[in-house]
Amino acid sequence: DAPIVKKIQSFAYKNSLKETDRATYQAMEALIHNLNTMNSRAGAQTPFSSINYGTDTSIEGRLVIKNILLAEEAGLGNGETPIFPIHIFKIKEGVNFDPDDPNYDLFKLACRVSAKRLFPNFSFIDAPFNLQYYKEGNPDTEIAYMGCRTRVIGNAYDPTREIVTGRGNLSFTTINLPRLGIKAQRNIGAFFDSLDELMDLCIDQLMHRFKIQCSKRVRNYPFLMGQGIWLDSEKLTADDTLEEVLKHGTLSVGFIGLAECLKVLTGKHHGESEEARELGLEIISRMRARMDEETKRTGLNFSLLATPAEGLSGRFVKMD
């Protein structure tokens, strides 16, 4: 009769939710474990990967967000913190920022996990430099960051398509600021001359690599291009070259060791002296202006970033 049917339905529903929740957790756990063990990048490295999440309020989306966070919190074998993927939790007022927002509980969970694992990092859609691109109801316009911390959304090549999906960073080269500071021997003018020279060299290198990448064909990238992952790649045939697709990507110059560079040049870093802080801002502003100048000249997306340098920091110290 009706009460029994209702009881059976309730039992089936609760157990289905429980099983789906468990299966989702295992899927997220598998994703994290696979991305830390598969050596498919250049045949010898794990993929440098990142995932951005936090704003999906659907039942399914919330289930995935919750379980990717719980799997990250649990860690790898022996409780080790997973290096990849880089987790970025997107924060938006009306979605997960305030206590009354539908995903506020997931924001609190993200804070708990970050306190233990240092991931996820957090991005703010409402920040003015991100909000200018945001269109409500269009997740493609929600800011996303790559594993290398490249911010991909502005598009000088095609301003009508300032979106995050189907795009990425093509190449970046890092400048060793402490080395330039040491060579300048506290001569600020000499430092900036060396920096300008190195910026020009980096841009030449990025353009050279870009031309090599553009000369490749769709068949050389059967997944990224052949499966239509990159923006406009679905319009190409197997023998087409890639320039019109790759122009949507970014070409980046990174910098490392700003604090150490300031210490060498002034005796103090930006946290110890207002003079050093002003010089630090001048250094970064000069590099940013050079990137903007190149963007205007070429119509390509040149960007500046602070290199994460998980491995490079040690290499540069040894080289110096």
Positions of the model-derived regions?
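Conserved catalytic cores of very large enzyme subunits
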Residues: 1-247, 268-269, 273-320
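Contiguous, well-ordered alpha-helical segments that form the cores/surfaces of helical PPI scaffolds
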Residues: 251-264, 285
